[in-house]
Amino acid sequence: MKKIIFSVIAVVAIAFATNINVQAQSAMSTSKNTKMVGGAAMYPTKDIVDNAVNSKDHTTLVAAVKAAGLVETLKSDGPFTVFAPTNKAFDKLPKGTVESLVMPENKATLTKILTYHVVVGKMDSKAIAAAIKKGKGKAELTTVEGGKLWAWMKGNKLVIKDEKGGMSTVTIADVNQSNGVIHVVNTVLLPK
């Protein structure tokens, strides 16, 4: 009888330990794919908008996306690659620019600027690196707005140049979303 009780306890203990191990592995794989942006976890199971609204570093971008009426577009299936400027990036613009852009009468200009930060398709850093290699050191990206961005490596940093000659550095790459990928940038990119 003691042998049977011991066997049952051993089986229960093994099953319990196996369950804990599976849960731990599942949590580790989720956390491995989840990046922190603006103090918030960016979950690859959520879309671009649902993640961005949680980043304290992207409140200006989120407000601009709402003002431009782009929420539904960026919640759609995509996939999209978004070069997401931080609040500090927007702060670099001349004083009053953001306040002016979010006014209803400037919606077309705001939409043009925001869609200039979006490329159709999911281009993670490996895909961008491959495009840079194929372009012999520089990749040309076509934006949803219809303009061009150029990407290259400067040391170990990915640099993006806009049509006006402005330069932005990717500060956090490969923030995977259910409908694409976000690369956090430190300067607002401006089309012609």
Where are these regions (language model features)?
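Bacterial N-terminal signal peptides that target proteins for export
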Residues: 1-9, 18
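Hydrophobic alpha-helical membrane-insertion segments
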Residues: 11-12, 95
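Mature, structured domains of secreted/extracytosolic soluble proteins
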Residues: 4-6, 22-192
